[in-house]
Amino acid sequence: MMSNRSDFIVPDEAAVKRAASVNFHLEPLRPWLDDPQITEVCVNRPGEVFCERASAWEYYAVPNLDYEHLISLGTATARFVDQDISDSRPVLSAILPMGERIQIVRPPACEHGTISVTIRKPSFTRRTLEDYAQQGFFKHVRPMSKSLTPFEQELLALKEAGDYMSFLRRAVQLERVIVVAGETGSGKTTLMKALMQEIPFDQRLITIEDVPELFLPDHPNHVHLFYPSEAKEEENAPVTAATLLRSCLRMKPTRILLAELRGGETYDFINVAASGHGGSITSCHAGSCELTFERLALMVLQNRQGRQLPYEIIRRLLYLVVDVVVHVHNGVHDGTGRHISEVWYDPNTKRALSLQHSEKTQ
């Protein structure tokens, strides 16, 4: 049977030129894009490249990778996928001509004079179950149990002993999800920055804030993302805390640091934290540790998707996802000054809720 010529898709000349333009602008990154051992290629700012090889990050200086070249790469990529990237639409998700996934963020959604480029290379590795077994892939499966893990027992012992400095340090090191709560002027952001200093310096960090406060002088592999304070998801603003949280999922963060939860983006934060991104740190306004969960639940309900969930389900999700709540207070009336007033850490409740849900679904 003869095939009709319309069965064959022939790229038009314009599409070929657009693909060629993208590949031309990718040339400074070609050594790492062509390296089969590299899984991720990231540009946080002009002149530098971070690559992931065997779950470890490597740094390379690339002097010819200047700001203008990165802007042109973004423009060429947007044209290739028939999208837009500009000051008014500064975030772009696309697939490159060779199949790599790319995420580009330009100002004002990131620091002025910088552009964030994250390229995820597709994996062509094929493994059998026997290959996994030989690599020890199945040796560390933990049965669902009411008993706490050694790390949970360690943290609980530190908290019960009142050694809160060591408790917080280990909570950060063990990648627990931490919420710092308190009233305005209580020192939430200052404590957040102290906790961030306990994060290993070789991790890739992404901050999300409306005002630049979360500086990371000791963590070279970082990206600062920004959104306008008045931006609201319901009003279809192009850049909000929620859109940047979703963008983070394509930027290979080890941790996401969100300066403050204020509204519907709380739903996205919980969703991201529940997806396996441990070690996130954020803050919110609340009068106590217990009220923190009430505040977070109310803010989840400000999200269109969050409103579809029953309040009880939201509360259970919060207890499952949030590991530590630290409440800070400014005792201006009693002379105690800024201090931690409460610490919530209850792995037993978390474990019971998890087992309860598991039993219901069986």
From Swiss-Prot:
Signal peptide: none annotated. Pfam families: T2SSE. It is found in: Cytoplasm. GO terms for biological process: secretion by the type IV secretion system. GO terms for molecular function: ATP binding; ATP hydrolysis activity. Gene3D superfamilies: 3.30.450.90, P-loop containing nucleotide triphosphate hydrolases (3.40.50.300). GO terms for cellular component: cytoplasm; type IV secretion system complex. Coiled coil: none annotated. ATP binds at residues 182-189. Keywords: ATP-binding, Cytoplasm, Nucleotide-binding, Virulence. Its main location: cytoplasm. SUPFAM superfamilies: P-loop containing nucleoside triphosphate hydrolases. It comes from the Bacteria. PANTHER family: TWITCHING MOTILITY PROTEIN PILT, TYPE IV PILUS RETRACTATION ATPASE PILT. Transcription is turned on at the beginning of the stationary phase of vegetative growth. The virB operon is essential for intracellular survival and is not involved in the invasion process. Constitutes a major determinant of virulence in mice. Virb11 is essential for pathogenesis in mice but is not required for intracellular survival. Belongs to the GSP E family. This is Type IV secretion system protein VirB11. It comes from Brucella abortus (strain 2308). The lineage of its organism: Bacteria, Pseudomonadati, Pseudomonadota, Alphaproteobacteria, Hyphomicrobiales.
